[in-house]
């Protein structure tokens, strides 16, 4: 990837873009009118684009910006007293969650809002574009109210891959360790607005040995969100599978 700016950037946007390119040791290009032509001209798969708004990622497949998406609706439902499928699986005394797959950020936001100040959420993201977009989004975006904004700010986002992180994590480091690798098998829809995200994602496999690392680093539970037919759920490690007929996702739980 490379770094560029929006069309007609102000001085601050130009400065930020140049500094980020230098920091990441990747190339900065002066913005040209057509990003498709820039991609072909310079042989780049995508660009981190800086402007007055938080950085976003562009690729030929689409554009990815940080936004809260369905997290807002899920929190709205919880405020009305309805349960959330993921949060319902957390132990009642949970004070720390490691989200190994930050990705589209929704679950990290939900978990941080649910735990509030009594707990912490640390999230991992290996993809450099998704990490940069996520880091700025968490710091800059404001929610509909103070609680939502505080939930965003409390998330600690690290640029790391989950295998390497878990291999070196101390035993019993987190109450819960969570994985959501399901975007490898997207739910089929007539329109898919997530191609920009998918083009930036890193598709690290969630394997049985990674789950063993997670079981060592977790104190109470390991939770995996996957498609119901996932081979992971047939490894014999999971003590519970939560899913209903007609749902496109299921949660596997390893109780420790």
Where are these regions (language model features)?
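S-adenosyl-L-methionine
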Residues: 1-96, 109, 124-176
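Residues at the starts of beta-strands that form the adenosine-phosphate
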Residues: 96, 120, 154, 220-221
């Amino acid at each position: 990837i490379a770094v560029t700016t929006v069309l007609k950037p102000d001085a601050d946007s130009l400065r930020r873009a140049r500094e980020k390119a230098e920091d990441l040791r990747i190339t900065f290009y002066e913005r040209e009118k057509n990003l498709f032509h820039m991609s072909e001209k310079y042989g780049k798969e995508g660009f981190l684009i800086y402007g007055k708004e938080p950085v976003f990622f562009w690729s030929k497949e689409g554009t990815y910006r940080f936004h809260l998406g369905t997290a807002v609706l899920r929190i709205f439902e919880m405020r009305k007293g309805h349960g959330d499928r993921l949060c319902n699986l957390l132990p009642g005394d949970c004070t720390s969650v490691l989200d190994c797959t930050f990705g589209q950020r929704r679950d990290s936001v939900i978990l941080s809002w649910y735990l509030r100040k009594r707990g912490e959420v640390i999230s991992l993201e290996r993809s450099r574009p998704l990490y940069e977009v996520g880091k700025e989004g968490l710091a800059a975006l404001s929610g509909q109210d103070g609680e939502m904004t505080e939930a965003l700010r409390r998330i600690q986002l690290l640029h790391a891959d989950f295998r390497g992180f878990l291999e070196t994590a101390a035993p019993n480091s987190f109450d819960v360790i969570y994985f959501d690798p399901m975007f490898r098998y997207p739910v089929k829809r007539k329109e898919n607005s997530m191609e920009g995200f998918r083009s930036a994602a890193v598709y690290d496999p969630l394997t049985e040995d990674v789950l063993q690392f997670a079981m060592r680093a977790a104190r109470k539970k390991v939770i995996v969100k996957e498609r119901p037919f996932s081979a992971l759920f047939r490894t014999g490690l999971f003590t519970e599978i939560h899913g209903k007929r007609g749902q496109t996702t299921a949660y596997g739980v390893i109780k420790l």
